[in-house]
Amino acid sequence: SLVVSSAGDVYSFGPGSNCGKLGHGEFEDTNQLTPKVIEALAGVKVRAVAAGLFHSLVLTEHGAVYSFGQGEFGQLGHGDEECQYTPKAVEALRGVKVSSITAGSRTSLAVAVNGVAYGWGCEDARLGLGLTEDQLTPLQYPTEQLCVKV
């Protein structure tokens, strides 16, 4: 689980054995029974968080997106299927000011302030992009209809 404090800090807690989904580093083989601040985000003001099955997303006050946890289906958006044990910026969204994020079990979605939506992760008809393979980096949805929020 993830929470954002009034100061914009992110805390996580819960089972910690799945590929760094809590964001505290590689050696998370025990449960985190109480909220613990994610040190890798120190100094970053966070506006929103989203938790998938074994991955997490963070949205900063400046519209940047970070991800961490299991990347087996590309749901982290880093161009690979590796685990990420601490938060890492989604480089494919650099320069895009994101206003909203959500995480599915094996997918991630973001909406930019201009209404353009992006999706990445397990394709298996979960993203609605008409693809047959997992999407390892954010892919822009067609812009015939702009989005407000995910």
Q: Which residues fall in each region the model found?
A:
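Eukaryote-biased RCC1-like beta-propeller repeat architecture
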Residues: S1-V150
